[in-house]
Amino acid sequence: MKIKKIPWLGHFDDRGHRLSIFSIHIHPDGSRIATGGLDGTIRIWSTEAINRENENENENEDLPKQLCCMSTHTGTVTSVRFSPNGQYLASGSDDRVVIIWHKEEAIPGLGSTFGSGEKHTENWRSYRRLLGHDNDIQDLCWSYDSQLVVSVGLDSSIIVWNGTTFERLKRIEAHQSHVKGITFDPAGKYFATESDDRTIKVWRVSDFSIEKTITGPFNNSPLSTYFRRPSWSPDGKHIAAPNAMNGPVSCVSIIERGTWTSEINLIGHEGPVEVTAFNPKLFRDKNDKLVCILACGGQDRSLSIWSSALPRPLLSCQNVFQKSIGDVCWSPDGLSLFLCSYDGNVLVCTFEKEEFGDMVSDEEISKALAKYGHGRHGIVLPESAKQLELEETAYAILKKPSSLSTTDPTLVPQSSSTPKSAQKTPQKLPAFLPNRLTAETVDTNKLTASKEQIASPKRPGPSDNGNEIPTKFVQKVTITKEGKKRVAPQLLTTLSATPSTSRLASTQLQHTGSSQLPPQQFSQPINSLPKGGVPILIVGNKTKVNHENDESDQALQEEKIEEGLLKNYYSSLIDSSTSISNINFEAPRYKTNIVHSLNNEQKYVLEVKNGTSEKNPTRIVALENGNTKWMDYLPRPVILVTGSIHFWSIACDDGSLHLYSLTGSRLLPPIMIESKASFLHCNNAYLLCISSSGMVYAWNVVNKTALFTANSLAPILSRVSNNVTIENNSTDIPHVVIASISKEGVPSVTLSTGETYVYSSTMLCWQRITEPWWAIGSREWDSSGLLQSNTQTESQPLKIYEHRTNNVLMDSGRGKLLQKMVADAITEEGYDDFETIVTINHLENKIASARLLKLDDEFLVTSEVYVRLLMHHGLWQKLEEFLGELRTQTKCSIKLSGREVVAKMLVVLRQAVQTDNEFDRANKLIEKYAST
């Protein structure tokens, strides 16, 4: 074995210092590796240059080392993973975005990047941006057939994405803490996730439901690891789980498939192990048994390599890095091991073929996986009695064609544009269904085309008997007012019943995995607005004339006239006093079942089974610790559910709100609003409801009082209507991203523009609390993207609002662009004090907002920063004005009077003095205000 560090391989800052590398992965063909680091970049390196390091330098001068550098992420890159088919590279970051990269074969590298000396010999472009996580992304993993990619993160969620279309299939929120690792079963049946809640959860790929929760090996495991990256053995038998405990000793737990028990612990590290990686190859030892090789690395900066045939490690290297090991990966041939560390170095270990034993062929690996159903398309051998029950249930459902139809067709409209031929096309069954089922019993709207159909689509043509009569096309002829005859053009081609081949599908590597999974329908309630917000329609906004079937000159003239009048038309569209019907939110989709837990705990759960009429009413069941506490029936379907420690609230599709106590008593008669509820949120004793027409309601349910008269969102949503053009149309109108109510009863709304508004019940108007302007211009803006604890989020709402703005800027990709524009602007003449002025204004706005919202902690903290800033910049008049205003107020906050706040500010002044001039001026202020 040889171990070497590559001096030129790393992520460096402007001064040449190494930056932490958090992830490393190798391409399936072994030609390149990818690294992701603290600088927010992904770098592609040539493995040929790495392998030739320390050889004749003259021969390697022209050999490219770094192939490409991608810097689209706005935060630290925590995970990089090539797809097994080699087409894509997936990267995750603490900017909460997953980016799918695709190598452009037809386009060469772009050479040097402007402003840097880095050369690019390959061109990797951002192919998809996957949004859905609410916090840092910690790990990614592809299924072995490249049909799925799963991301996990610090928001405790697991998101499953389609590996071809990259649409989100399902979001799973079963873990109770940060999810820090993910691995896929090579047989394609399961994937496993590891979390700081000290569990590993095994999930079925067929329906994304949980197979087993494993807790035993992780009791008292430390929560200090940055990652918990497990690995699945290539024969499918075992999972290597890092950060496990064997009594007081840290270890790696080996979990056996099927029983999901852990009888083997690998002990050899002094600190917690963060990452494990099985060699993708199997080896045969002297006793003719198949052997797996496992590499482990962690916080003790040591590397250990284990063989399943030996009780002790094959290799144990201590202090190979100066900091913890972040990621480990094996080359496809199983003879090279790559490690990266937080100290910014990459270690390469190369082995000889005989060191691990005789390497077995890929066919033998497939045979080892065959007993778990790998490679079987028609039928999969069941691994448990529960799977047999699921198959029998699926068979019973598919025997009833009507059972796959929508419960209420009036609530969920079906697409009318699907060709009849497409509806009748037989579809191949999913791999997890029994082989005895026929394709004719499956509703093609519920299942996607099989992999074979996608890989080789057929164009529509004549039938097999050759007697099909072609359809006669009839062109539409219209006569205008001027007597001119207009003939509408007719499309001669027809739509194919089979989806057309995409550029990506045509180049896919062939795998023996299951067919493409259909999008999943979730059973959880829509208790928050979607990440991208809900569509908003201002009544009367006609931004484009639809003249698909009318090509008359009059229609074209009307379009030109409308384009000229459009700007003035929007400026007077909405008045600030407008209430109903100016805004139209999309109502939540109908759900057959809704389950909502109180405060995300399973102790109190409300389950809703929706009906369709009075003959089939909606059933509501409240559970406490799994036992039925109370039950009720409603004649209308339920669309939203929320709850607090004081009450449950249920919204029906007829615009009614039903309020129950936790014991099931009705607190009030049903509250009627003017339209369906689009959003429902509660906090403590307060309930917030936003209707589909944009009306905002808020009540104190305990006191049974309204906080204010129903108010419209129109004033804050119509601000940019003057900027709407025919080209931009309604998609540029701002929409609501997040809405909530604080524990003090203050409603807040965050728009897609990054602005957050709160409604003041004393001023009776919407007030803007945060906006992107402060984020890009103020030095005191919190752009860390982290909230330290739940207690902090409860006591610092303004901090939450600023994080919302950060999230919107990062999701839209505008953050870096705006910061660069500001950085360029302040270098020009006349902008010397730009950042100082904007920072002072930001702090003043934050102080006023804290007083408005009665936030004592944030008011005091921001006031202290404000006082220090004014003193250091010599703005003594502003400082004296601020102290004088505080002194005159009898009640400056909930807990403190104005004089008490002034006393605290004087202490801050005394501590912040640095120069003699500041000392003299500060003493005068202290003497003036300390005596009053």
From Swiss-Prot:
GO terms for biological process: chromatin organization; chromatin remodeling; regulation of DNA-templated transcription; transcription elongation-coupled chromatin remodeling. Residues 405-470, 498-520 are annotated as: Disordered. Residues 405-426, 441-453 have a biased composition (Polar residues). SMART domains: WD40. Residues 498-507 have a biased composition (Low complexity). WD repeats lie at residues 16-55, 72-111, 132-171, 174-213, 222-265, 268-316, 320-361. Transmembrane segments: none annotated. The keyword Flavoprotein does not apply. Disulfide bonds: none annotated. It holds the Pfam family Beta-prop_CAF1B_HIR1. It is found in: Cytoplasm; Nucleus. Keywords: Chromatin regulator, Cytoplasm, Nucleus, Repeat, Repressor, Transcription, Transcription regulation, WD repeat. GO terms for cellular component: chromatin; cytosol; HIR complex; nucleus. Probably required for replication-independent chromatin assembly. Required for transcriptional silencing in the outer repeat (otr) centromeric repeats and the Tf2 long terminal repeat retrotransposons. Repressor of histone gene transcription in G1 arrested cells. Required for repression of htb1 gene expression outside of S phase. Interacts with his3 and slm9. PANTHER family: MEMBER OF THE HIR1 FAMILY OF WD-REPEAT PROTEINS, PROTEIN HIRA. Belongs to the WD repeat HIR1 family. This is Protein hir1. The gene is hip1.
